[in-house]
Regions:
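Secretory targeting and sorting signals
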Residues: 1-41
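Low-complexity, acidic Ser/Thr/Pro-rich repeat tracts that form intrinsically disordered stalk/linker regions
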Residues: 32-76, 80
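Serine-esterase "nucleophile elbow" of acetyl-processing enzymes
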Residues: 60-133, 190-191
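Structural recognition of the beta-strand scaffold that forms the well-ordered cores
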Residues: 81-93, 126-131, 168-173, 178-180, ...
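A solvent-exposed, charged loop/short amphipathic helix patch at secondary-structure junctions
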Residues: 96-108, 184-214, 257-278
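Oxyanion-hole/transition-state-stabilizing segment in secreted/luminal serine hydrolases
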Residues: 149-211, 249-254
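Catalytic His-Asp segment of secreted/periplasmic serine-dependent ester chemistry enzymes
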Residues: 248-367
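Extracellular glycan-recognition/adhesion modules and their associated mucin-like linkers
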Residues: 381-409, 425-455, 470-496, 511-513
Length: 513
């Protein structure tokens, strides 16, 4: 089926400054309050609310382009459509190919023809990308402000598309450019690294949760506004799927496990290692919890992508995000727009988004999570929330919890018992379909029997998930056993010792609850 692609853009934005010559970042938008509007649920047959004259003129022109005449058609006589709204995370920033006129100099929405909305497997005649790099919720909500002179407020664009097509899915990715200021924070972190000014975690960590708490109501109101737009266009809430998609982490600390790691300068991983740990383990998870809360309170379908790029971060073997990138083709002197593509999903990242969205749409789920399990390069949708899936495992004999030593997820890290706490390095998820045990630190590290040594005394470690025999385990009561050697059990011989294989004997030291 041929799709007509219309584009726009999005924000989370530009990150990394260029060596010393920056200090700027992605940019975009301005705040704005949200108008609280509630519309009664309409049937699909209900007449739409008339648009303001200026928007109606645009709608009529677009209808003529699509159908050959300007009138608004009944839903069942329209072409089907998908639409994405939001910021740079979904506009296509970072892909490298952009639709005119969104590649400057007066419009930097950076909408890509390879953005996720254009690449799903969801059957649709038309796809629309009205997101814009740098957008915050004030550029999306009802009564908001356009980012550029040739742009509409994104909710107005939705109102037009909803009257000219039968919209099947509305995708929203927003919030990073509100209180969080993700782009400026990333820019500052990179600048501090390039200028040897010290890690940025101490600067931002104390107020990070407050930033998340501040953006949640704005995202919630934006979702409600989009519902209102659709109701005013004659849709019942059940006529389409409204998806709020969470953000993945573009960075992580395990890039040195890449056997072909070329160095940070080459792959663009400009940042302190400690900041990559904080970003993956704390900053992005806190943001994810806020987005999940916004979806739950508004009834939107939620797609948790917080672990989607695990194993595919900047500088890994198969990165789904772009590292620090300076666009030397941009006319004029280097500025924030020269680096705005940095630390955004690349074409493979958008392909991953598209796959997750396709699976989500087909599933009918109201909440789901997506990740690449076992390094296949193919995202898999799970009918669960990652926050609910990962749990501690406590040893019955010692009272210790199964722990990743020093909260380090590098290949070869020991797995041991330790005093229980709330850290992610003590949470685990057992994938019953694949029999793998994943650490809460990253979806890309699994419990591993090194070198397939299924003998007594072998110590368990973390390793890049691959789904091989030495990473498959069975649950038998409260015991965990290698699937290839079910007569041996994971055992903690004493407090704070490494977990080792021993012949199963039914003792408390082999039971984890």
């Amino acid at each position: 089926m041929t799709r007509t692609r219309y584009r726009f853009r999005r924000p989370v934005a530009a990150v990394a400054t260029a060596a010393a010559v920056l200090g700027t970042m992605i940019a975009a938008a301005a705040p704005a309050g949200a108008a609280d509007t509630t519309a009664g649920t309409r049937t699909a047959a209900a007449a739409s609310v008339p648009l303001p004259p200026a928007l109606e003129a645009i709608r009529a022109a677009e209808a003529t382009k699509i159908y050959g005449s300007p009138e608004e058609r009944p839903l069942d006589q329209r072409k089907s459509g998908l639409i994405s709204l939001g910021d740079s995370e979904i506009s296509g920033e970072g892909v490298g190919t952009y639709e005119p006129p969104t590649n400057g100099p007066s419009n930097w929405c950076h909408r890509s023809p390879d953005a996720a909305v254009h690449r799903t497997g969801i059957a649709a005649d038309l796809t629309f990308n009205v997101s814009c790099s740098g957008a915050y919720t004030g550029n999306i909500k009802l009564g908001g402000s356009p980012q550029y002179a040739d742009e509409l407020v994104q909710s107005d664009s939705l109102a037009i598309k909803a009257r000219n097509t039968r919209v099947k899915m509305v995708l929203l990715v927003a919030g990073a450019n509100d209180d969080l200021q993700f782009g400026p924070v990333m820019t500052d972190c990179v600048t501090r690294y390039l200028l040897s000014q010290g890690a940025c975690e101490p600067k931002y960590a104390p107020t990070w949760q407050a930033r998340v708490d501040g953006l949640v109501p704005k995202v919630e109101q934006t979702v409600r506004d989009l519902r209102t737009v659709m109701r005013d266009a004659g849709y019942a809430d059940g006529d389409y799927k409204l998806v709020l998609m969470g953000y993945p982490s573009p960075i992580g600390p395990d890039f040195r496990d890449n056997p072909n790691f070329p160095g940070k300068l080459v792959c663009g991983g400009m940042g302190y290692d400690s900041d990559t740990v904080w970003g993956r383990n704390t900053a992005v998870p806190a943001f994810e919890r806020g987005m999940r809360k916004a979806a739950a309170s508004t009834g939107a379908t939620y797609l948790d992508n917080s672990r989607l790029f695990h194993g595919h971060e900047v500088c890994t073997e198969d990165p789904w995000a772009r590292g620090l990138y300076i666009d030397l083709s941009k006319p004029g002197l280097p500025d924030e727009n020269s680096v705005r593509q940095s630390f955004h999903p690349n074409a493979r990242g958008h392909a991953a988004f598209a796959s997750c969205l396709t699976q989500l749409y087909a599933s009918g789920l109201r909440e789901a999570s997506c990740a690449d399990v076992n390094s296949t390069g193919r995202p898999t949708l799970f009918p669960l929330a990652w926050d609910d899936a990962y749990r501690p495992l406590r040893n019955q004999a010692t009272g210790d919890c199964l722990d990743v030593d020093a909260a380090t997820s590098a290949n070869g890290t020991r797995v041991l018992g330790w005093d229980c706490h709330d850290g992610r390095n003590q949470t685990w998820w057992y994938d019953s379909a694949r029999q793998t045990v994943h650490t809460g630190l990253t979806q890309d590290r699994c419990l591993d029997v090194p070198d397939l040594q299924y003998r007594a005394g072998t110590g368990l470690i973390l390793w890049n998930c691959h789904g091989g025999a030495n990473q498959r385990f069975v649950r038998d009561g409260a015991t965990l056993r290698p699937a290839a050697a079910t007569g041996t059990c994971l055992t903690q011989g004493a407090a704070k010792e490494q977990i080792r294989l021993r012949a199963c004997d039914g003792s408390a030291s082999q039971k984890f609850a």
